[in-house]
Each structure stands twice: as structure tokens, then as C-alpha cells.
Regions:
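Cap/insert and terminal regions of metallo-dependent hydrolase folds
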Residues: 55-132
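Core dinuclear metal-dependent hydrolase active-site scaffold
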Residues: 1-69, 127-166
Length: 166
């Protein structure tokens, strides 16, 4: 079908004695990182909840990280989206999955700035709603825009492109 799915993280199996199900922040370290690529050279990277340590390990491993679209690691937390990782992925578009005015402050302002410094279009789910992206035309479609009649309030200050409040 012309699509390749590659699991980049976690590796084969946890080391002997390490539990498969981890709690707390350690469970973020075991999240799935998936690269989806087409035969036409278009790719998306779904980074799950990895943090800086896992990003660095992926960069050092030489894994195929380059992607047109990146689902931002760990909802854009301050422990993710390191310079080295963003330089390896080099996405044109990054999607942040975060709740509107969430208690964690995701995406974190320094993370948003790292994307902006690289000219990466950053779109957050509070502003976009459900996002769909096509590898054929490279277009992002926001459900919030397509179904405006269902949305009764403006989203402000969520750290994404098109913020009304910035």
C-alpha cells in the first residue's frame, strides 16, 4: 500500500527485571514513537510522551527521525522538544495535543519558542480541534474551523499559530 510504519521506541524488550508497566514519569520513557512514511518520501513522526532523555537516545541511535509532520513530544512539556531532536526531525508542521488552559501549561512557552525559532508551524489542539493532515496535498484541516457552528467561544493564548490572544 506504499506506507511503512516503523516503531522507533521503545526497543525490543525492557532489560531483565524491569517491569513492563511503569508508573509516573517513568511510563513516559516507555511510550511508543512511531514513524509513518510513504513511498513518495513523505513522513510523519508520532513522538508520544517521550522526554529529553529519550529524544537524545533516538538522535544518538541514528534512527530515521526526519519528518514533514511531528506530533509534539509530551504535549509540548518543558521536558521535551530539545534542540537536537528538532534539528534531527526538521518538521514543517508540528501538532500539539493539549487541553485548553490545561493545568500543566502545555505547551510550555520555551518549547513554543524553539519551534518558532526554526520556522516550524505549530498548531495546538485547543485552537484547531481534531486535526487531519494529508500526505497527498500537505494540507492541515482543523475540525474547529470546518465545524464553526459547534464552537461557541474563542480560544486564546494556547501557544499555537493563530492565537487570538497573542
Amino acid at each position: 500500500d506504499g506506507v511503512r510504519l516503523t516503531v522507533l521506541h521503545p526497543g525490543e524488550a525492557p532489560p531483565a527485571g524491569e517491569p513492563v508497566l511503569l508508573r509516573g514519569s517513568a511510563s513516559n520513557a516507555r511510550t511508543c514513537v512511531l514513524r509513518i512514511a510513504t513511498d513518495h518520501g513523505v513522513a510523519a513522526l508520532l513522538a508520544g510522551d517521550i522526554e529529553r532523555a529519550q529524544e537524545q537516545a533516538l538522535v544518538r541511535s541514528g534512527a530515521p527521525l526526519a519528518a514533514d509532520v511531528l506530533v509534539v513530544p509530551h504535549h509540548g512539556s518543558k521536558t521535551s522538544s530539545s534542540d537536537a531532536f528538532l534539528d534531527a526531525v526538521q518538521p514543517a508542521l508540528a501538532l500539539v495535543q493539549s487541553g485548553y488552559r490545561n493545568r500543566f501549561g502545555h505547551p510550555a512557552a520555551p518549547v513554543v519558542q524553539r519551534y518558532r525559532d526554526r520556522g516550524i508551524t505549530l498548531v495546538a489542539s485547543p485552537a484547531c480541534g481534531a486535526a487531519s493532515w494529508s500526505s497527498q496535498d500537505g494540507q492541515l484541516r482543523c475540525e474547529r474551523e470546518r465545524s464553526k457552528r459547534y464552537w461557541h467561544h474563542r480560544v486564546v493564548g494556547d501557544g499555537a499559530e493563530g492565537d487570538e490572544g497573542q
